[in-house]
Amino acid sequence: MSDKAKVTQERILDAAIKVFSHKGYHETKVDDIVEESATSKGAVYFYFPGKQQIFLALIDKFADVLQQRMIAAVTPVNDGVERVNLALQVCLETFAQYRGLAKIFLVQAVGLGAVFETKRLQLHDRFAGVIKSYLDEAIAGGEIEPIDTEVIAYAWMGAINEVVIRWVYTGQPEPERLITPLRAMLLRSVGVPAARIEQLSPTPTITSKDN
């Protein structure tokens, strides 16, 4: 794909984030995305066969951004607990910074039918697997006691999902206020001492975006 084509495709996706996050999936029409992106219907259909494919592409885009950020954050770090901490922190930061995408991923993709549910479950499995891998590393390094990391990873996903969905709907609590107690609760749940949690990288200042 040429650079020009990539720019056009990204413009369409960025426009779709705004339209879907404001109107919802069912109320959004392809014409709305065409208008918001300042492209043409032909251009939109050249890259995406329909509204469903645009929506699924946005879910993939959010998942890719999230995973790339997590990998970039933890790669320079050898400490297992710190890697878990950074992965969790980046996850919450990304949801906060890409609120429109988070709304699409966590809220609107629920209950839209089998295709969307399959995609959503695939991504839950993908990120539960990432969390599990970092917990396994912490166990291998002797930093936490052996636990069933698969079960814990899905429990963590559930906790993160609930607090972020509330934030997406209400804007509360503020991201910085959300991260610190949630991180402490999750890390204590796998046996990380309070004193060790206090030594971890501090919560950064987070700027929320609409897309």
Predicted feature residues:
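N-terminal intrinsically disordered/low-complexity leader segments
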Residues: 1-7, 147, 196-211
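Amphipathic, non-transmembrane alpha-helical scaffold segments
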Residues: 5, 13, 59, 63, ...
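Generic hydrophobic, amphipathic alpha-helix propensity
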Residues: 8-16, 33, 54, 58-66, ...
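Helix-turn-helix
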Residues: 11, 19-53, 57
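Hydrophobic alpha-helical connector segments
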Residues: 57, 71-100, 152-156, 176-179, ...
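Amphipathic alpha-helical packing segments from all-alpha helical-bundle domains
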Residues: 67, 71, 115-140, 150-154, ...
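Amphipathic alpha-helical segments used for helix-helix packing
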Residues: 96-115, 132-133, 165-169, 199-201
